[in-house]
Amino acid sequence: MKHETIVLADGFRVGVSTVGTGAPLVFLHGLSVSAKAYEEMLTRLAEHGFRVIALDAANHGRSGSLPTGHTVEDMTRVTLKTLDELDIHRAIFAGHSMGGGMVVEIAARHPHRVAAAVLLDAAAGQEHHDNIKVGHYATLAFRAAKKLGEAVTDIVGDGYEAMHLRDTGEKLSFLGMLRDSVSGLRFVRAAFALMKADTTPLLHAMYRHGVPTAVLHGLHDQIVPYEAGLSTAKITNASFYGVDGFHSWMLADPELAADLIALALLDLFPRRYITGAG
């Protein structure tokens, strides 16, 4: 996998990771990590015949930072500028968690650029927003503690499964990859942008635009409720896949994740249509 940092016309730096040849598939990662955390899954996707382009989001990885108070739409503007720089004007978009919320934003506002959307435990759906909504500052500490407890449960569940599926050498490689992918505390700005977001009208826009969509969601997700995945799929008329895992099941079993993404895309439409992306 090739890792590089490109500089946009406005001077903003963006970390870009690429692997494979074929239909372009843009992958957007989850909160607090970077594209590198998903390297095993992305490499497997390339083996399925995709040209994978994984971007470090603003405030993450090797990418620059946006000012405090920015929105998710601001983050997607950086994404689209980067793809313009790479001469990618239409692609399959897949995103996990925060990245899934960004895919929803792009698909709703720029449907001509999205050949298909694959949402992996995406930060989308009314149940998700109800779970993290900004406000009621008197209870903020309690809500923060509650979410932290859920996140710990989720991470432990996926982490145990990830270690269970790997041999000793693979375990060391996996832990090193996660360590290298963590983005410090800059991601807090992006977290606040997610708390202010409202994807429900965007999901309806995706449906109106006829964006082919697949939703893959962990049955035991403690961060984005399973019900949010169901409602996201219902609004967008998406194919839905329930996965026996937590919020980051694709890190625990990257081979399964890549195979499911490929299966979902083949289920949405013929391969000859997918290869028309770009």
From Swiss-Prot:
Pfam families: Abhydrolase_1
GO molecular function, one term: peroxidase activity
SUPFAM superfamilies, alphabetized: alpha/beta-Hydrolases
Catalytic residue list: 97, 221
EC number assigned by the record: 1.11.1.-
Keywords, alphabetical: Oxidoreductase, Peroxidase
Claim: Ion transport is one of the keywords in the record: no
Residues of the AB hydrolase-1 domain: 24-240
Keyword Oxidoreductase: yes
InterPro entries, per database record: AB_hydrolase, AB_hydrolase_1, AB_hydrolase_fold
Similarity comment: Belongs to the AB hydrolase superfamily.
Name of this chain's protein: Putative non-heme haloperoxidase
Gene source species: Mycobacterium phage D29
